[in-house]
């Protein structure tokens, strides 16, 4: 048993990050206000991994906790990038380790300087062997193995890769620019 004093930060905001394994959808990542009032306040948004920076920001934006990250009653804005990074790391864990059944990080105390996980718990579950890669997930991670470069005329190279979520605006503009024929 390890007992330490509670981490206290003057302008710290208490948040929570979690993940659970749904039998149909696989891992689901949650984010919201944390601390001792987590069950009372019930501020939580959920997303399916894999997360990228855009999806992590969107997950944060969909909660009331996002307002607590802004400058508040004399406290400077909290380091949202630190929370985004924690969400991305949790996403990597549940994507790459199919035997992780649950993750509970509560509270995460975030300040202008960064974020600290004060209490964390990871639950494991048996996984039948052998298991196909990412079979435990509804959405598979971006297939980097399909990226490649090819030589073209003039000594240049052409980069070819699968579409990414951040390509959406450019794809819309491309489609809008096509002729009716």
Indicate residue ranges for each PLM-predicted region.
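ATP-dependent carboxylate/acyl-activation modules
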Residues: 1-181
């Amino acid at each position: 048993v390890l007992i330490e004093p509670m981490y206290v930060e003057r302008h710290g905001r208490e948040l929570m990050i979690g993940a659970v394994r749904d039998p149909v959808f696989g891992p689901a990542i949650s984010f919201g206000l944390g601390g001792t009032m987590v069950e009372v306040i019930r501020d939580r948004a959920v997303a399916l991994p894999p997360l990228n920076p855009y999806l992590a920001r969107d997950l944060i934006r969909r909660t009331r906790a996002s307002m607590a990250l802004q400058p508040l009653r004399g406290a400077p804005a909290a380091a949202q990038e630190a929370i985004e990074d924690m969400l991305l790391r949790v996403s990597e864990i549940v994507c790459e380790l199919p035997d992780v059944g649950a993750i509970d990080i509560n509270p995460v105390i975030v300040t202008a300087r960064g974020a600290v996980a004060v209490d964390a718990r990871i639950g494991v579950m048996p996984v039948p062997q052998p298991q196909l890669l990412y079979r435990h997930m509804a959405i598979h991670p971006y297939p980097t193995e399909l990226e490649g470069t090819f030589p073209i005329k003039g000594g240049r190279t052409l980069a070819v890769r699968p579409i990414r979520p951040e390509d959406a605006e450019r794809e819309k503009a491309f489609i809008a620019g096509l002729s009716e024929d």
